[in-house]
Amino acid sequence: MQENMRTALSIAGSDSSGGAGIQADMKTMSAHGVYAMTAITALTAQNTTGVTGIFEVTPEFLSDQLDAVFTDIFPDAVKIGMVSSAALIRVIARKLTDYRARHIVVDPVMVATSGSKLIQDEAIDTLKHELLPLAELVTPNIPEAEILSGMEIRCPQDMEQAARAISETYHCAVLLKGGYDLNDANDLLYKDGTSTWFRGRRIDNPNTHGTGCTLSSAIASNLACGMELEDAVRSAKAYISGALAAMLNLGKGRGPMNHLFDLKSSFIREVD
């Protein structure tokens, strides 16, 4: 009997198209050999072309989900994605504190890949002041980092200043993702006063639905397995590159990645 499987919890929204949110997180965690659990913050009606509806769960039900997970299968790492309201953020912060959760990775999801807004304005301050200080790592893209830092980011030097400002304000490590609107796939990790660049080539693939969810859940999976943060980020970036390079082509808009591109099994056969 296998007793030593590592575990991770995704606290995020559900994506009906399966490319982002908890669906992407569960695929990613499973691909890393980690047992995935979820606490759903919202149901979304979305596909590769956009978000058409969001149905938020109640704070009480989110609280019940978190209690159910933490009192039974305690997660080795926690990834937090889409949380659209201040009330839900407060529930998460309280439960993570009460249960002394470890290896918390926050992906401050504010806008979907399609451009649809995913968080209420009043929730941003709650995210900043109640959730980010609990994080081991926060993984903003450039627009999100501009909101969190209050700075305009137009070059790598701006990225370093913004990452430093976020880290010093909220006392967490920051992985600032440069691929959003800079012409490269270089990401910056700022931790304990030190900047580390992760250089990457931009893969010519328009199907990038769920890349942020996937990267943060890959990092959380690696932390759950005992990796140091820098190694966890490096490994997660390699995984993302592989998933993008697999060139899955589904949907009419920005399609999903192949999260299981490296899964080799006699039970899996290629579709003709």
Where are these regions (language model features)?
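Nucleotide and nucleotide-moiety/phosphate-recognizing core
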Residues: 90-98, 172, 186, 194, ...
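Phosphate-handling active-site elements
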Residues: 33-37, 196, 222-236
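Conserved N-terminal subdomain of the carbohydrate kinase-like
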Residues: 2-10, 30-106, 110-113, 117
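Short, small-residue alpha-helix embedded
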Residues: 23, 146-147, 205-229
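N-terminal basic/disordered segments at the start of proteins
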Residues: 18-34
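Charged C-terminal helix
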Residues: 56, 230-272
